[in-house]
Regions:
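Extracellular/periplasmic juxtamembrane helices and adjacent flexible linkers that interface
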Residues: 135-158
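Flexible, polar/low-complexity N-terminal or interdomain linker segments that lie immediately upstream
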Residues: 14-71, 153, 158
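Alpha-helical scaffolding within the catalytic cores
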Residues: 46-49, 81-94
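Second-shell loop/turn segments in exported
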Residues: 32-39, 76-79, 107-111
């Protein structure tokens, strides 16, 4: 092989490798989605189920802030992205101690895209509640709760 061809091929290889090194796995300039809750404020469905099924356990206050079935013991508020439901939610909070464990869930869709979780969470924070948990439903209530056989409120016609 001629030395010129070897040099040209070497140049092409070096050029191609340098281009590859400049690419990134994530788009540059797009901010990551942030949420008002911290990771330690997420509650796994299995953990809530354990609380609900423990004998003589201290039960949290659970709010269903969506339009899906009620988890056992949940207070059904409805979609809090609707102003009257948000006001009803605030009324329900008036006689609850600020340190009480409160768990909120919607379950209509993945909670990270839910139009109800953030308004409810921010309302709780604004009102001074200190023990807030968001039920981690990455898909929806049906997949992450009901399909696992966790308890629903049987007094409501589900």
């Amino acid at each position: 092989m001629k030395p010129g061809i070897i040099a040209f091929i070497s140049f092409l290889c070096f050029f191609a490798l340098s281009l590859k090194a400049q690419t990134t796995a994530t788009p540059v300039g797009l901010p990551e989605k942030t949420y008002p809750w911290a990771n330690n404020q997420l509650m796994e469905p299995a953990d809530l189920n354990a609380l609900l099924t423990a004998p003589n356990g201290s039960l949290p206050v659970i709010f269903n802030i969506g339009a899906v079935e009620d988890i056992k013991g949940a207070r059904h508020i409805g979609a809090v992205n609707n102003a009257p439901n948000l006001e009803a939610f605030k009324k329900q909070l008036t006689n609850i101690s600020k340190s009480t464990q409160i768990i909120i869930y919607c379950g209509c869709c993945p909670f990270t895209r839910c139009p109800n979780i953030q308004p409810a969470f921010l309302t709780l924070k604004k009102l001074g509640f200190t023990n807030i948990k968001v039920l981690d439903l990455p898909v929806n209530l049906k997949t992450n709760w009901i399909a696992k056989g966790y308890p629903l409120d049987k007094t409501v016609n589900n």
